[in-house]
């Protein structure tokens, strides 16, 4: 085994300083790309010079690159911020639109239900009014028919036409019968054709006034006839004449009740003319 001097051993074991410089040059790739042509390896002095030049260039390149980064980095943030902002603005509008549509649909459904309830109530009122009109027709017909037939024969015979109270009761019931018959026909025609026989803007007021007047007249006529019957019975006692007069007066009083309810319905129609 040949002997080796200490100088040679030290030179072999000590790493060349150019390795570190080579590592540094190899690490910096940006400088190599910036150069127009690749430079061949040089000596240690030239490599150290190149390192110094690279170190000088690095701050300049960083200074040049930093403004670009500062200018570019806010742009994505602004875009993202604007995008997020627009999304946040759009979402509430959609929610509000949905809520508004729900409210509007709820209001429409509530309005439809109110209209249906009102139309149903109007139909019920019309049928009730027709029922009272038919009752008035029947009761008034029975009342004046009995009163017109209240006559007795013989030497002690008597007749209703001799007493003004009975004549008054018969006349009022005849008028009530004619008026109630016309109103019953008009209501029946309105339920079928949805229009009146005589259409006028004063018709509800006319019905209300006539119902009130006839109800008052029927009450007065029935009261006057009852007074005459009571006077007859107290003087002469009961007989067929007084019994028929009493039956006619009872029907006249029931006719008054029917007209009283009809006057309430006509008052309702007067203050709700839009439904007519």
From Swiss-Prot:
Q: Where is the composition biased (Polar residues)?
A: 1-13
Q: Which InterPro entries match?
A: CASP_dom (IPR006702)
Q: Which Pfam families match?
A: CASP_dom
Q: Where are the transmembrane segments?
A: 127-147, 168-188, 206-226, 245-265
Give the UniProt keywords, A-Z: Cell membrane, Membrane, Transmembrane, Transmembrane helix
Subcellular location(s) of the protein = Cell membrane
Q: Which PANTHER family match?
A: CASP-LIKE PROTEIN 4A3, CASP-LIKE PROTEIN 4A4
Q: Under what name is this protein listed?
A: CASP-like protein 4A3
UniProt organism field:
Arabidopsis lyrata subsp. lyrata
The opening ranks of the lineage are: Eukaryota, Viridiplantae, Streptophyta, Embryophyta, Tracheophyta
């Amino acid at each position: 085994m040949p002997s080796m001097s200490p100088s040679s051993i030290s030179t072999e074991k000590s790493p060349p300083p150019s390795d570190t410089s080579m590592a540094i040059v190899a690490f910096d790739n940006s400088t190599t790309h910036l150069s127009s042509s690749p430079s061949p390896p040089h000596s240690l002095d030239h490599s150290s010079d190149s390192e110094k030049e690279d170190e000088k260039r690095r701050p300049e390149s960083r200074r040049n690159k930093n403004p670009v980064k500062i200018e570019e980095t806010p742009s994505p943030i602004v875009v993202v911020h604007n995008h997020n902002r627009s999304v946040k603005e759009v979402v509430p509008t959609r929610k509000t639109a949905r809520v508004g549509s729900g409210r509007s649909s709820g209001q429409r459904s509530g309005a439809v239900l109110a209209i249906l309830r009102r139309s149903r109530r109007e139909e019920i009122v019309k049928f009730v009014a027709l029922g009272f009109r038919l009752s008035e027709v029947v009761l008034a017909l029975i009342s004046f028919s009995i009163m017109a037939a209240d006559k007795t024969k013989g030497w002690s015979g008597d007749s209703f036409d001799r007493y003004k109270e009975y004549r008054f009761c018969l006349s009022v019931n005849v008028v009530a019968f004619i008026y109630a018959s016309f109103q019953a026909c008009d209501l029946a025609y309105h339920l079928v054709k949805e229009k009146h026989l005589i259409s006028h803007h004063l018709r509800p007021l006319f019905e209300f006034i006539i119902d009130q007047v006839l109800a008052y007249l029927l009450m007065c006529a029935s009261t006057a006839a009852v007074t005459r019957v009571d006077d007859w019975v107290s003087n002469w006692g009961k007989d067929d004449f007084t019994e028929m007069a009493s039956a006619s007066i009872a029907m006249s009083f029931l006719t008054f009740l029917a007209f009283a309810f009809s006057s309430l319905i006509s008052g309702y129609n007067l203050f709700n003319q839009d439904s007519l």
